[in-house]
Structures are given as C-alpha cells and as structure tokens.
Amino acid sequence: MAKGQGRFRPLIRPSEPKPATLSFWNLVEAHVLRALRTEHGVSVKALRTALDYAERELRVERLLLSPELRSEAGQLFLERYGELIDLTASGQLAMKQVLEAHLRRVTWDDARFPIRLHPFVASGAGADEMVIAIDPAVSFGRPVVASRSVSTAVIVARIDAGERPVDIAADYGLSDADIEQAVLYERAA
C-alpha cells in the first residue's frame, strides 16, 4: 500500500451494512458532520477522537445525533450536567462558549431522537430561517416547505413549466419568500 493510504472506520455508520443503506438518522449525522468540517473547522482526526471517546467513556453511541454536541474553534464538546466536556482532549471540562446553529435546525422527539431536519438554504440574510424541512413522516422524507408541507420539487417543476412564482404561492397559501427558499434549496441540491 502506498504511503498515506489506508482504511479507516467510517465516521457515520450506515443503518444497514450490506448493502450499505443510509437512514434519516444518517442524513442528520451527515448534516452535522458537514457543518463540523466546513463551518467549524473540526479535523477528521478530532472527530474520530471525539466519536471514540464519547462511545467508549460516555456511552454515547451516535455522537453526531446528540443534541448536547457543541463545537468551538475546531474542537468538539458534549454538554453534560451543565458543563462542557472537551471530547477532543479526552474529556477535559471546557468553558461554555459554543456555536449551536446547526443543532438548532434539528427537531428532537421526547426520547431525544431526531425527527425533522431544517437544512440551511442560503447564507447571509435569511440563513436563520427554517422554511424547508425534511421529515420522514411527511411526504416520504422529501424536502417540503414546512408551513404547508408542499414539496419543493413540485414548486420548482411548476416554475420550470413556466408558471409564475406569485401564482404558485397563491395556490398553496405560501409567501413569495417561501417560494424563493424552495427554489434556492432545489437548485442547490
């Protein structure tokens, strides 16, 4: 094997190993993983260390699904008992300065399992809005405008067919901003 090549355990475990099948939980894990890597600068090594430590020492089987997961300056933390445990430094306690934007976009049920994801659609103005939702219990998990459960793909198909966005908005009781978010989401996907 050439230098620098090797096999590593994946950061996200598929729900079914053979054939590799991804679940809704895997989608949420990928959403959080992408955010940690691209927006928070967490290295793969730090992620692997954190995942291993959380599983081995804290009995957290799916760290990327944990609503207590936090990130700051390329490090991962787990909030426990009002303190932050630094998962990338073998469990040292850390200060409570965290970025929670990505985890706030996940809706959790009473058993603390993820049930709905509101993916980011745009950066800058409007980035905090949660117009689009992915929910396995709605529209078979396809992206929808959350307020009315209207498929984003249907909205874009109608626009592509030549219909005016204002007419589509009126048909579904959506705002012009909802239509714009649906188009932005579908065009980015």
Segments from the language model and where they lie:
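Major-groove DNA-recognition helix of helix-turn-helix-type DNA-binding domains
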Residues: 1-15
